[in-house]
Amino acid sequence: KDLLFLGTEFGLYASVDDGDKWSRFKGNIPKVAIREMVIHPREHDLIMGTHGRGIFIIDDITPLRSLSDSILDEELYFLPSRPYFISSMGGSQSFRGDDEFIGSNPRDAVYISYYMNKRHIFGDMYLEVYNEKGNLIAELPAGKRKGINREAWTPREKPPKVPSSNVLSSGALFGPTQLPGTYTVRVIKGDKSFDGNVEIKFDPTLPHSKKDREMQLTTLRKAYDMLENLAFLDAKIQNVMEQIKELEKDTSTIFRSASK
């Protein structure tokens, strides 16, 4: 409730203490006149009209809404973000109705947001993601700047190994999406660690039942495992074929030597 935005002739300003202190909001927002603003009721995006330079959108201001004076003193504090929804996409058109973005689409990723009261300079700093079983499933770089850092994690498993083929198919370029649930995110900052969490959910706008969605994910994982097993068998066959070729070369050499 203490978060305020102010559009001025020289860009966007924000306050997290009900207007006592103001700071210019940078984040790729230029010093242009902000004439009108609206917060999208579903996506929680801040949409700004400049009436000259176009429209600027700040995706998901949920992390900003949780900022307070006490948080600003924290060494590192995880900020809430909207859940990631598993959607059903097509090849070139996803048929998502008013969920379809016409401008530059936000990256299809889980956003991990955290605040730091000072820039991290010395020592390692990176992010780890753990599933509900406590298994490490992803590691990615972590933002080190003072203020709000927002990192994007693509919640997919690595692409499956596939058998060799002369035909190009894009179906195996991506791994399956991680299962719905709550995932632990951990920032390793020097010799310290800080934990937060993010959520992955089924898209509530889709008509499919939870049972159907779970069946789809189970089938995808079975296909993933089958591809990996097939790739393993293919590699063994290719190895045997190479050995046969080498033996044929050796046998041919022996026959030629014996016939002299």
Placement of each model-derived feature along the sequence:
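Beta-propeller blade termini and top-face loops
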Residues: 1-101, 107-110, 115
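Extracytoplasmic/secretory ectodomains and luminal regions
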Residues: 68-260
